[in-house]
């Protein structure tokens, strides 16, 4: 009977059944084989709904979808261009920063490629950058902001990790702060490589004038305060994360619907439905995955995995190397939400056993995922960019390779220099 269930689950996975159904079948089979009541799965679904922090997830997601429906991306690029366009290769640096900020606000790298790609790619080409460089930049920069507040994957990692008792506690705010330096490191390395690559070239600069800065800031006057209000409220203790998410949603609605009038009241319904369909899928997978995690804990799978790994891998450095290889492969094959709900419950106890703090693991996890998004042959952003820019995949492989190598250097530094993530703890 058990073997028949295993075969059915393998067939379900092979034919592309929804992830939640595969996880549900696996958890039910595990509990059935251990003579545990199957009601435990329903209990886990309720437990995840009863998590106050989870309120932030749909609210931040809705805000991101709403921003992507407006002209926020154009105003954001104009602000960055007015401030940094005078630098050598300034437009490329503008693109890096704008993509990182927009991904953080919307929570999805694919949205950044679609929304900013149409704006940045022609601008980079007209600015004198090669087509290969421009395409590679937009494709890879789409995932940079995953480490920056209020990134939805960052919140989701915190929610999952806090459900697992590993003897190390942390707050979501600590997780937000931990992502700042690693993101800045990536931006600095990418910008430095861009400057070196185009040294002595004829890339034109945009003349810096206070008039241009003032005009760009004025156009974006209702959106610029948003991150300062949210971050200031969270870090000062005025807002909890869930309250900050509510403030963000209300602020974005007021700015885009009432002040800018770029999203109509009628459109709010469709944006809400579209964003909540995504959130509903995440919550369904998350609840069932936590039920599956409960079975794994009862069966002592993480402990057995820990013992097995320590038999062959003695040092934390060796574990981190293996972890990076595994996560890069997963990032190329799974979307970030599926990877989080499946792997964090397995990896977190093992990582803590090697002396790795949960906050550091979270930054390593998401940094790997962002590189995995454009890792050949099946990184998700490669397919999105191929469709959006009508480029063959092989051309994108070549275009993204230099950026990938730079980010792998940053990833190694983030992995092996914990203070980059834990300086505030």
Predicted features along the sequence, with ranges:
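Alpha-helical transmembrane segments of multi-pass membrane transport proteins
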Residues: 1-425
